[in-house]
Amino acid sequence: MSNDLFAGIGVVPGTFLLPRPDANWTAWACVACDQYTSEPEYWQRVNTLVGHQPSTLRLILPECDLPAPPERIDAIHAAMRDALNVLHPGVTDGFVLLERTTSTGKRLGLVCCVDLERYRYDGAKTLIRPTEETVASRLPARLAVRNGAPLESSHVMLLLDDPQRTVIEPLYARRGQLSPLYDFDLMQQSGHARGWAVTSDTDKSAIAAALNRLKDALGADPLLFAVGDGNHS
């Protein structure tokens, strides 16, 4: 299916790499690099839990470890190259429907690719806008990790005002008809995650149509997505 349906709405389908089915998914998935910045003991526990297993822990630079020497960046890039040996395209030209269960309830989401041409952090009235001021001092480390990186493990979370629940919930209601991708416990009592592949032209067209309706209802200079987390990523 052509991505023309998604032109101008800020997100598009993508290819998403996932670990092989027999991998330790609990060890693979860790929290974002900007969490637990004042709790190095949390990251020490995660490091012990992960050990030598493949993990996104090795692909990020926790902010509690800043400043980082150049060799730390080199090690992250080496870990990314190693990870390519255990990852495969879980979804091609599609989305991932996500369900995360925590102690406070259930959250639904849609993993997608973000059109960065629709985002600015300098106060411009773009389709995608930040929710906090960008701290320039936090950017160099992120840029160093991305410079020459063979993988991207972004933790950006976009918020969408959809009071009628027209984008994600229809997919979730028929999740039994979608191909399951993963179903596992998250580390450190962080809850449980399940994911399903969204790849059919019918489903992608429905997503695009719903987002376009929301955008059209906003009038001039629409704010369709707010960056709820990952403003610096």
Locate each region found by the language model.
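A sequence-level detector for short glycine-anchored, His/Arg-bearing signature motifs
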Residues: 223-233
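Catalytic-face loop-and-helix region of soluble metabolic enzyme cores
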Residues: 206
